[in-house]
Design a protein with these regions (language model features):
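Elongated, mostly alpha-helical coiled-coil "stalk/stator" tethers of large membrane protein machines
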Residues: 1-150
């Protein structure tokens, strides 16, 4: 990971933590990351398009997001660093998980787990790790049975 990604991601996280909106920004940045295609990010650094036009595109596309995230994306666009936005958001997530002591896990099973099974698994993992746990569930029909935790 490059220094730009670390610095900008850390700056965004520190601001969010100080202003008590880290949870809200985490939720919104995840949604934004899903929308950012490679083509869109390259458009945001295209020198043949004026900076003001690129920034207006960001304002139009993301007018409903938290002002800190919108301003962050505008700043990155202004500085020609728009392609670093997803990496900066990744750094934000890493710092969030470190600060709030959340462990990420992936549970892969042959069949979808019921809500009750998910709840029991999350409780057991939290008890064993002593931390909050965020589990991503994946179904892999090639598994014969059981579950794999990563």
């Amino acid at each position: 990971m490059n220094e730009i990604v670390r610095e900008y991601g850390a700056g965004l996280f520190e601001l969010a933590a100080e202003e008590n909106c880290a949870d809200e920004l985490l939720t919104e940045e995840r949604e934004i990351k899903k929308l950012l295609s490679r083509e869109y990010l390259h458009f945001l650094i295209d020198p043949s398009v004026s900076k003001e036009e690129r920034k207006n595109c960001v304002r139009q596309a993301f007018s409903g997001v938290h002002p800190y995230l919108l301003n962050f994306m505008l700043l990155m666009t202004e500085r020609g660093l728009a392609t670093e936005i997803p990496g900066s958001f990744g750094e934000y997530e890493k710092l969030y998980y470190d600060r709030y002591e959340i462990v990420k896990a992936t549970a892969t099973s042959a069949f979808p787990l019921t809500d009750e099974q998910k709840k029991r698994l999350e409780e057991k993992l939290a008890k064993n790790t002593g931390h909050r746990v965020e589990v991503q569930y994946v179904v892999d029909k090639t598994l014969i049975g059981g579950m794999r935790l990563d």
